[in-house]
Amino acid sequence: MKLNFYIILLLLLSFVVKADQIMELIKIPNLTLYNLENKNSLAFLKPTKDFFVGSSSENVSCKKNQSQNFNKKFLDAQRSIDKYNDDFFRKIKLKYIVLCSELEIAGIPALGFANPEMKTLILNINTNNSNFERVLHHEVFHLIEHNFNKYFLNISWSDLNLKEFKYSACSTCSNNYSLEKIYNSKGFVSEYAKSTISEDMAETFSLMMSDNYLILDMISKDEILKKKVKLIENLVKKLDAKHQF
């Protein structure tokens, strides 16, 4: 009985240490540990106060959550990550998911942000329900792309598009891009997918993960998108042969 007590005490102390070291680990202040997923070792974090980190030109800011909305979005995020195999996030080096409100990147409102260096995703819980899961998968793909860049070196993604199509110079260079799903668009699942190659890949992956029935319907009518989906499948299978879309 005494041995069991010491084991429980050790686990509790370890839990507190992790919470106290959040600032040191991911360089974001005012966060507390909300939930630790044993299955995939993901830590869900929530802000106790608003936070602002970074320089004036490169910064991330987010606000403390409303508890009711936070709990719902936390459950939504859990359901989304359950679609991945247990060791998937270890492979892509994701350890922390921050859920907060009114996320901004360099002063621009954002739905999500991936920080590969800190092994962290930041998700805006103000995102509407239909887009929240897509945003999570979208940001997961950015981690895949960053940590497995070697898989992307020899692909010619832009060659799949119509010759006259040109991507924008950056993902925020236009105000015309939205996450609204579009059909028969000659290779694109949303307007935002038209911004850059990286965002196009992430948008395609996000819809494959969040609504596979819809993506199957879309590729039955869009040969360009069909090729993109096949390419994404092949890339992800290199990382995890058992991954299911």
Predicted feature locations:
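A general structural signal for short secondary-structure junctions and capping/turn motifs
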Residues: 2-3, 89, 191-192
